[in-house]
């Protein structure tokens, strides 16, 4: 009877998950108790498959913070273990619960130990039985193999658990990176839209000022016209109400003046002639921005190098150049349009740099070969600015005239057989929707191309030279022209 009660108590304090006595028991809100390690492992599995924590027995949900240690059950388990380790209880374990005889035999069919009375019972009649000492080593070896197998499975299970955790961490990193990229892409979109909105509003304000200015002038003209008509009407009324002498005095002149009166209609502005707003092409803008981002990967550290005497001043850090007016009494004549070069020289690879030309009314920049190789002392102005003379440049003149300089091809050039000729360059007008404050220059030496980007306008291509023939090392080229505001080399972080 005591063993039956002991069995009932043992059943009450057995973990439903591992089927062993409770270890550090924790109780759920529903009242069921489990080993701390068992319910923790079950919590991970439950979250993985169901997305919430639930009791393994009744499936009622619970919160992990509501798990509470059950000290009462822990005390019962501790005392139960003490009782089970007592000699008299261990003796009861070694004896048959049904017959009270010592358990000395092993039934192969049932896989259990029995006493000699059990062997003779109808239940075990015809079964193969052996002394426990005879089969102990055999099953010890089997259990040892099973133990090694389970240990290996435990390692595999732990590895699988670690793999899942690693995959989970990897996914978290990947998702976070995707979030960062998405936020960056949409920020670029918002920046582009903000820039386009600002430009459209500025253009609209300019249009408004222009139209209203002309309408105000037209209104003033109409006021003067109305006043002139009123003066003539007053003169006619005075003559009609006066004497005959007043009526007929210079009457022919008055009639001729009236006949010449022609009302001028005010100037109007038709809506059809207005600039029509069109939503920006975001796909094209993103493609342009992507191209700019791609070439910016080849950002080169360029510094300005003083050349032959010129009308330019370079800053101490070699990042800025500006025009300086010549001193009148100097006898040395210097051709300012040669500008200055950037260092180092370029003989291969891809190179990119940006130049700040904010608020300048004139500038020229691009790429050229050594000034000593290109300088033609008999040429003045911009006639040297031609690819055949070793210049691949674009520029601004008079604050709004953007242009690129291409080689001119004249018959006399062919007859001369020389790279340096007196024929002026071919001027290619460049039309800007947004005037560039920053210009990006990208040189691909192997591809023989030089591209200019309007960084202010999200990287739209300004102009591109193709099939460039680089027979010498080439250099970045900068010419502030006669505008005293500086040209500044930009850093990648600016």
Curated annotation (Swiss-Prot):
Residue span, B30.2/SPRY domain: 280-494
GO BP: activation of innate immune response; autophagy; defense response to virus; innate immune response; positive regulation of canonical NF-kappaB signal transduction; positive regulation of MAPK cascade; positive regulation of NF-kappaB transcription factor activity; protein K63-linked ubiquitination
Cell location: Cytoplasm; Nucleus
Residue numbers spanned by region Required for interaction with GABARAP and for autophagy: 186-199
Description of how the protein assembles with itself and partners: Can form homodimers and homotrimers. In addition to lower-order dimerization, also exhibits a higher-order multimerization and both low- and high-order multimerizations are essential for its restriction activity. Interacts with BTBD1 and BTBD2. Interacts with PSMC4, PSMC5, PSMD7 and HSPA8/HSC70. Interacts (via B30.2/SPRY domain) with HSPA1A/B. Interacts with PSMC2, MAP3K7/TAK1, TAB2 and TAB3. Interacts with SQSTM1. Interacts with TRIM6 and TRIM34. Interacts with ULK1 (phosphorylated form), GABARAP, GABARAPL1, GABARAPL2, MAP1LC3A, MAP1LC3C and BECN1.
Protein name: Tripartite motif-containing protein 5
Post-translational modification: Degraded in a proteasome-independent fashion in the absence of viral infection but in a proteasome-dependent fashion following exposure to restriction sensitive virus.
Keyword set, alphabetical order: Acetylation, Antiviral defense, Autophagy, Coiled coil, Cytoplasm, Immunity, Innate immunity, Metal-binding, Nucleus, Transferase, Ubl conjugation, Ubl conjugation pathway, Zinc, Zinc-finger
Residue(s) carrying N-acetylalanine: 2
Pathway assigned in UniProt: Protein modification; protein ubiquitination
First-listed, main subcellular location of the protein, grouped into a coarse class: cytoplasm
Biological role stated in the UniProt entry: Capsid-specific restriction factor that prevents infection from non-host-adapted retroviruses. Blocks viral replication early in the life cycle, after viral entry but before reverse transcription. In addition to acting as a capsid-specific restriction factor, also acts as a pattern recognition receptor that activates innate immune signaling in response to the retroviral capsid lattice.
GO molecular function per UniProt: pattern recognition receptor activity; ubiquitin-protein transferase activity; zinc ion binding
Pfam families according to UniProt: SPRY, zf-B_box, zf-RING_UBOX
Source organism phylogeny: Eukaryota, Metazoa, Chordata, Craniata, Vertebrata
Recorded catalytic activity of this chain's protein: S-ubiquitinyl-[E2 ubiquitin-conjugating enzyme]-L-cysteine + [acceptor protein]-L-lysine = [E2 ubiquitin-conjugating enzyme]-L-cysteine + N(6)-ubiquitinyl-[acceptor protein]-L-lysine
Annotated binding of Zn(2+), by residue: 96, 99, 118, 124
